[in-house]
């Protein structure tokens, strides 16, 4: 989807052709993003389910670089772990890989947090 959602209010957005292809939960995530003045064009895409949209929205709300995980190849659990690593100021390149499942990502994040705390 192009950046057609920027500068639109919710009423105008609901009238767009592309908006009707989203399910109720996806539409809600888009509405919340518009209300919070986020760039919903980043996640208002058919390839993201509502849970993935939510993780991306949370990252946008926290001014994180969501480009690291705003990819449909990541499931929402993986997105959560990458977002948490960004929030913890850890090196996301270590495990922001689709071949790692969310449990492996969580374990890696835990090890990195432990190392970080012992260095302080």
List the predicted regions and their residue ranges:
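General marker for long, soluble alpha-helical cores
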Residues: 1-120
